[in-house]
Each structure stands twice: as structure tokens, then as C-alpha cells.
Amino acid sequence: MRAIAALLLLTAPACALDCKLPAKEMARTELLFGAGTVSESAWHQFLSREVTPRFPDGLTALEGYGQWKADGGTIAKERARVLLIWHSPDEKTDAALDAIRGAYKKQFHQQSVMRVDGEDCVSF
């Protein structure tokens, strides 16, 4: 029974957004970066070198705070940065987002960069 329910969920059509004109449907990706030891200057250099060339149409960068349960059960806490990027969903964009994540992990010695994807109705 569980297998049938899972199969039905996988084959069900995705719900389309009902965007009201002049809004149009766009994909949204949130990238969440640990910023514990990353200076403001290093962050801006990273944005200029790795992010802006891949997403020249624009993005939003936010400062935040994050916490999670680390190995051993302790709560780890650190400053965080969040990028919000609205874009067309395609393989080239996915590759660009993954390249940004990889570059950040390598440059700043991070274990991960969280990625959250969704859809929004967008108008300017």
C-alpha cells in the first residue's frame, strides 16, 4: 500500500502557480552560507567573483543567524548569509548554483551550503 501511495505522489502533476498579471512564475533558490569566520570583505569579494557573473540580473543578500544540532548533540551557532535568487529553472542555472556552493565550501572550508528551491509569482 505504501508503495502505491508513493507512486501516486511521484506521478501526480505539480501544482502550477496562478500568477496574476503582470506577475510571472519564476523559480526561487535560497542559498544559506555559514559565515562564522568569513569577513565582510571576503564575502563581498566572493559575491563579485563567483555569484554576480553567474547571476548578473540581480539577487538579494541577507545577513542572518543559524543554528543546528552538531555531532554529539551540541547546538552549533554562527552568523549566516542568505542569497535569494529568482531565475528560470534550467540545467545551466542548476550548474551555476552548484558551482557557487562548491566554490564557497572550498574557499571557506565549509561542510555544506544549504539550498532551498521553490516557485514564486514575481512582478516589478
Model-derived regions, located:
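Active-site-proximal beta-strand/loop segments in catalytic clefts of secreted hydrolases
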Residues: G34-G36, G64, W86, G118
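Helix-rich interaction surfaces within compact, conserved domain-sized segments
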Residues: I75-F124
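N-terminal secretory signal peptides
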Residues: A16-L62
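Hydrophobic h-region of N-terminal signal peptides that target proteins for export
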Residues: L8-A16
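Short, intrinsically disordered low-complexity segments
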Residues: D57-V82
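Sec-dependent signal peptide recognition
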Residues: M1-A6
